[in-house]
Design a protein with these regions (language model features):
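Short loop/turn segments that flank or connect secondary-structure elements
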Residues: 1-234
Length: 234
């Protein structure tokens, strides 16, 4: 996302939520003296920003069902091969091919990696609206499965990527072993971030997310091997 898009998202967020002005400056790239604090929880290494000037960590808490911006404003919903089966069955499709044909889009897009290296992704994405087109990939569209109460009509069989928010994750090769890493997505859409002196308040969330994030990365990697998605680096 561009800084302009993030600022627009923050402006929209602040119409309904109080958002710490220090965090706003950080999200907009105006605070740059930041330490990447890495902590291993089970099989995932989390990268938590530490603001040196404030001597504070950035933590996160869940505001659902009062907030469901992650469902209203996600840019895409890439599916794993597991998702193709479970969601297809949930939508009463007798075979996966018909589900893919009618309910998904195959798109190719570029994403910056954690080191700044560009990654080209090709994924099968769930349509967030019935008539979504490939040209709308990456734009904010409210998910058609979100009901008036802020709940997902597919739950618990919603896409695996939905369970990751607000984290982004990736794999790194460490001495021949794949290691899962995760950090926050700062898109300007989530009111759940706050400043804290230590990580104690978020220990339970990190434990729960470590399992979710690890399992998703294994499923995503398997999806690549099975030919339902592709990744290349430039």
């Amino acid at each position: 996302m561009s800084q302009k898009e993030i600022q627009e998202s923050l402006d929209l967020l602040e119409k309904h939520w109080d958002f710490d002005p220090i965090l706003r400056k950080f999200v907009l790239g105006k605070i740059t003296v930041v330490t990447d604090f890495a902590i291993k929880v089970k099989d995932v290494i989390f990268h938590v920003p530490y603001l040196n000037s404030e001597k504070k960590y950035i933590l996160w808490k869940w505001f659902w069902p009062d907030c469901h911006n992650c469902c209203d404003r996600q840019g895409r919903l890439p599916l794993t091969s597991d998702d193709l089966i479970t969601i297809g069955k949930g939508l009463k499709y007798k075979n996966t091919a018909d589900f893919i044909k009618n309910e998904t889009l195959t798109v190719t897009y570029d994403e910056p990696g954690p080191s700044g290296q560009m990654t080209t992704m090709t994924t099968i994405n769930l349509k967030r609206k019935i008539d979504e087109t490939a040209e709308e990939d990456g734009t904010h569209i409210s998910c058609r499965f979100l009901d008036d109460a802020g709940a997902c009509s597919m739950h618990p069989d919603r896409p695996g990527v939905c369970y990751l928010y607000p984290f982004a994750s990736w794999l790194e090769n460490e001495q021949g072993k794949a290691r899962v890493h995760a950090t926050y997505q700062f898109t300007g859409d989530c009111p759940g971030f706050y400043l804290a002196d230590n990580l104690d308040q978020m220990k339970e969330e990190l434990r729960a997310y470590s399992t979710t994030i690890y399992d998703y990365n294994m499923a995503s990697n398997r999806t690549n091997r099975e030919g339902f998605s592709a990744v290349s680096f430039s």
